[in-house]
């Protein structure tokens, strides 16, 4: 019965049958790894697994934004983007370049990780 529950009702059932290479984390990691010593910021949302996939350490204390009302976490992320201090930014917003024009979208992927479809965007700093 437990096995049937897992197969039918597990929240990660949307991932069944997908190859690892089809995940946005691994697709974006391929792009990020083309830059030696790349830096990355997971902007404005919970950690999406992109740091681990790319083999990159977070550049700051607030490497993601949680659901806690901590102004410092947002301020640190805004400061990093204002200073163009990271090579890449991964976000769930498709208009980051409107506020930070030094970054442009180089990849996007719509993905269902079990909580509904979302679109991840990878931005690169314009050189």
Regions found by a protein language model. Give the residues of each.
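Transmembrane alpha-helical segments
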Residues: 1-20
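Intrinsic disorder/low-complexity segments
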Residues: 2-4, 30, 125
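Aromatic/acidic, Gly/Pro-rich catalytic loop(s) in extracytoplasmic/lumenal soluble domains
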Residues: 87-127
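Short periplasmic/luminal acceptor-recognition loop of GT-C membrane glycosyltransferases, typified by
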Residues: 14-70, 74-97
